[in-house]
């Protein structure tokens, strides 16, 4: 299977997993608070829908997308603007925006360049980023509803972008990136071991892929993970790891607090 087809299949599956959480919800549950400060379930969904529309624009009209970047307000403002929308309409918006973006993604070659809010990306990385966002915001929704989702091997896409974004976590905070390489050795939900980085690196991040993915998307405090960090460069990275574009995220407090 070629890379783009695999990514699109997995993005479709990740989307369906979120839709299954949302479909049975009574309207009141769309207002439940999620672990993201100030965001209800509805805000997680409007966020995805808005950025799906932006993703379609980035692919179909890259110049127009780039020209509009300076006018984009904060994600909190975008969430506020959509708060008057009734839940059935909001779910419809998400479905339509996601469906349209999937259609335009299907016409891309893995190596095509797509502009975005951070640096431009290859089409493969771009679709991977949408999957990562869908999974991470879906996690917030699941947490709000008290649902434990079964992790899948689709997490390898989130892990890939999390690993590649190592320089970004430092750059976005104006910090120098340690020169030493870091290796990642993660156990996938299906039991296989997934690795990235030089085999002889002295600094290593080891543990469950789920924990790594929660950490790089800032959905968990590092102290609440089962990750083993070998070497200072590994710890320095994981303390600020950020797989998503935008300003430094606030992360999550330790569960014990």
Where are these regions (language model features)?
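Short, helix-capping/interhelical loops that line the mouth of catalytic, cofactor-
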Residues: 1-6, 53-107, 112, 154-155
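Amphipathic, well-ordered alpha-helical segments in soluble domains
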Residues: 14-17, 21, 51, 97-100, ...
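C-terminal interaction segments
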Residues: 201-257
């Amino acid at each position: 299977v070629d890379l783009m087809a695999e990514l699109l299949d997995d993005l479709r599956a990740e989307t369906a997993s979120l839709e299954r959480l949302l479909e049975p919800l009574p309207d009141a549950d769309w207002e439940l608070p999620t672990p993201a400060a100030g965001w209800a379930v509805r805000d997680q969904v409007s966020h995805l829908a808005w950025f799906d529309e932006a993703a379609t624009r980035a692919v179909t009209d890259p110049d127009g997308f780039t020209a509009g970047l300076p006018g984009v307000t904060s994600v909190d403002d975008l969430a506020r603007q959509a708060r008057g929308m009734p839940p059935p309409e909001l779910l419809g918006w998400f479905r339509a925006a996601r469906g349209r973006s999937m259609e335009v993604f299907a016409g891309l070659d893995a190596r095509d360049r797509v502009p975005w809010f951070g640096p431009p990306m290859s089409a493969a990385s771009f679709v991977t980023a949408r999957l990562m966002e869908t999974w991470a915001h879906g996690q917030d929704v699941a947490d709000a509803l008290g649902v434990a989702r079964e992790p899948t091997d689709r997490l390898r896409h989130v892990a890939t972008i999390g690993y590649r974004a190592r320089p970004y976590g430092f750059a976005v905070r104006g910090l120098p990136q340690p020169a030493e390489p870091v290796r990642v050795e993660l156990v996938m939900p299906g039991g296989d071991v997934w690795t990235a980085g030089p085999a002889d690196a002295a600094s290593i991040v080891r543990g469950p892929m789920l924990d790594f993915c929660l950490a790089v998307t800032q959905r968990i405090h590092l102290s609440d993970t089962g990750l083993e960090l070998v070497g200072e460069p590994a710890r320095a990275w994981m303390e600020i790891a950020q797989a998503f574009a935008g300003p430094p995220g606030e992360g999550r407090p330790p569960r014990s607090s």
